[in-house]
Amino acid sequence: MTSKKLVNSVAGCADDALAGLVACNPSLQLLQGHRVALRSDLDSLKGRVALLSGGGSGHEPAHAGFIGKGMLTGVIAGAVFTSPAVGSILAAIRAVAQAGTVGTLLIVKNYTGDRLNFGLAREQARAEGIPVEMVVVGDDSAFTVLKKAGRRGLCGTVLIHKVAGALAEAGVGLEEITDRVSVVAKAMGTLGVSLSSCSVPGSKPTFELSADEVELGLGIHGEAGVRRIKMATANEIVALMLDHMTSSSNASHVPVPPGSSVVLMVNNLGGLSFLELGIIADAAVCSLEGHGVKIARALVGTFMSALEMPGVSLTLLLVDEPLLKLIDAETTASAWPNVAKVWVTGRKRSRAAPTEPLAAPDSTTAAGEASKQMVLVLEWVCTTLLGLEEHLNALDRAAGDGDCGTTHSRAARAIXGWLKEGPPPASPAQLLSKLSFLLLEKMGGSSGALYGLFLTAAAQPLKAKTDLPAWSAAMDAGLEAMQKYGKAAPGDRTMLDSLWAAGQELQAWKSPGANMLQILTKAVKSAEAAAEATKNMEAGAGRASYISSARLDQPDPGAVAAAAILRAILEVLQSQGA
């Protein structure tokens, strides 16, 4: 079965892709009648060396993404995984020659079709009197025994584009550029690993891998690698890759003894997530530095892909300061990363976390008995939430990811652990602020953020007073913050429904002579009724808002949890005769 591809036609996909790149990049032009992209400022290259490269399509952004000042002059593209036509290569050579360049260097990956076609075009151009040289790049470090065909050309070719481009931009002659990049090409190695195959448009996958296997050392066209290994962690696979490509027992290895300086290239083969790419980059940096290798630059991204192949290749280039300056030289090529000219090894990679600001003076503190009461309230809230864990999870499975109870239990355990460390702040405002930070850090999820917002805002009115009107104002402030940032409103089937209902009842605390427990009892009953009523509501916020209302026939777990917290507070205060 062929895989799905977003193309207009199988036959025209390479042309369409190149046309799209040129259409969106004013510094590029197509060469009429050919699958060739050139710099649009060719006339500015008069008296300089031109650099041409290319190969089969399907390796984007290679090679056309590397056209620009300081890199390639132009690229000749073939059909997917197919060498470009000799006629198009020759047309590109003639085009740059007619623009007044003093010679052309062809940078070619080591594949038979590319060598033959670029080589034939070179000979024809030389017969016409055009100075043309060719460098064949073979940086594959997969095979321990070299075959007659030599090492395959892989992602390291892009580094040759960069070095040659910097030299050409500096006005260096054709012969010297050819000699210098030939030396550089021998000082690097690349090794890839794939989790599964890719597929050419209109065709089946190029190979199959078992679910627990990865292919080590495969080519960028899906060619077989050196062996298949069992799936392992990113750290283990990266360590294996680096060991294989630097081992002296490997005839195609790149020698990287301790103390060496390298440029590291972490290349996405097309289908790897950026998350995985970052993990692999970290593993590669740690592994190399652990072996005493100094990393001058680390280039991470997609440089030479194999269509949608989920895999990665690592390239190591041995560098000294002169070569590093060429890597760092400016370029306008769209696919070259903007990397700081700073050594990776030796750079301070973390900054000390800011110290917490000193607590602002607070005129309100709870007396000893009141402070003990706060501890009892918090302990009972924790016990209540732990007992509701499975019930809340069950309610959440209908409309979310089934972790509401787990999230609230995590908060309860964090609070219980915090209480064991010592007495909580005696100031209600400081207590709520501490709880806010604790929940933001430990509870997680949107619930942690919402409770954190609520408590942070609620703490503000309690800095000056802690009478009943101040506690009512605290409830108002917390609800306002939840609505402002959570974008929920009463009736949206969220925890806000319970808290809002309670908050309306607590307005009575602002009246002179208000009875604290009577009003709180009414507030809790209203919160519980509001929580139960959410089962008849259509969700307007949160994950449940994406679920059909026909499937929501249970109360919202967040609302149930909020009502249960209020009930726990009431029960402790009643037992204490507050």
Curated annotation (Swiss-Prot):
UniProt cofactor note: Manganese or cobalt are requested for FAD-AMP lyase activity.
> Which Pfam families does the protein's record reference?
Dak1, Dak2
Residues binding ATP, per UniProt? 401-404, 446-447, 486, 494-495, 556-558
InterPro entries assigned to the protein according to its UniProt record, in alphabetical order: DhaK_ATP (IPR012734), DhaK_dom (IPR004006), DhaL_dom (IPR004007), DhaL_dom_sf (IPR036117), Dihydroxyacetone_Kinase (IPR050861)
Which cofactors?
Answer: Mg(2+); Mn(2+); Co(2+)
How is the activity of this protein regulated?
Each activity is inhibited by the substrate(s) of the other.
Specify the DhaL domain's residue ranges: 372-571
The EC number(s) attached to this protein equal 2.7.1.28, 2.7.1.29, 4.6.1.15
* GO CC terms of this entry: cytosol
Instruction: Give residue numbers for the modification (Phosphoserine).
Output: 350, 511, 545
Q: One biological-process term from Gene Ontology?
A: glycerol catabolic process
Question: Which Gene Ontology molecular-function terms are recorded?
Answer: ATP binding; FAD-AMP lyase (cyclizing) activity; glycerone kinase activity; metal ion binding; triokinase activity
Q: Which UniProt keywords are given for this protein, alphabetically ordered?
A: ATP-binding, Cobalt, FAD, Flavoprotein, Kinase, Lyase, Magnesium, Manganese, Metal-binding, Multifunctional enzyme, Nucleotide-binding, Phosphoprotein, Transferase
Q: Where does dihydroxyacetone bind?
A: 56-59, 109, 114
Active site per the UniProt annotation: 221 (tele-hemiaminal-histidine intermediate)
Give the catalysed reaction(s), semicolon-separated.
dihydroxyacetone + ATP = dihydroxyacetone phosphate + ADP + H(+); D-glyceraldehyde + ATP = D-glyceraldehyde 3-phosphate + ADP + H(+); FAD = riboflavin cyclic-4',5'-phosphate + AMP + H(+)
Asked if the Swiss-Prot or TrEMBL record annotates the protein with the keyword Disulfide bond, the reply is no
List, for all copies, the residue spans of the domain called DhaK.
Answer: 9-336
**Purpose of the protein:** Catalyzes both the phosphorylation of dihydroxyacetone and of glyceraldehyde, and the splitting of ribonucleoside diphosphate-X compounds among which FAD is the best substrate. Represses IFIH1-mediated cellular antiviral response.
What is recorded about the domains?
A: DhaK and DhaL domains have differential roles, individually DhaK is inactive and DhaL displays cyclase but not kinase activity.
NCBIfam families for the chain: dak_ATP, PRK14479.1
Subunit details: Homodimer. Interacts with IFIH1 (via the CARD domains), the interaction is inhibited by viral infection.
State what protein this is by name: Triokinase/FMN cyclase
Please name the source species.
Bos taurus
Q: What is the lineage of its organism?
A: Eukaryota, Metazoa, Chordata, Craniata, Vertebrata
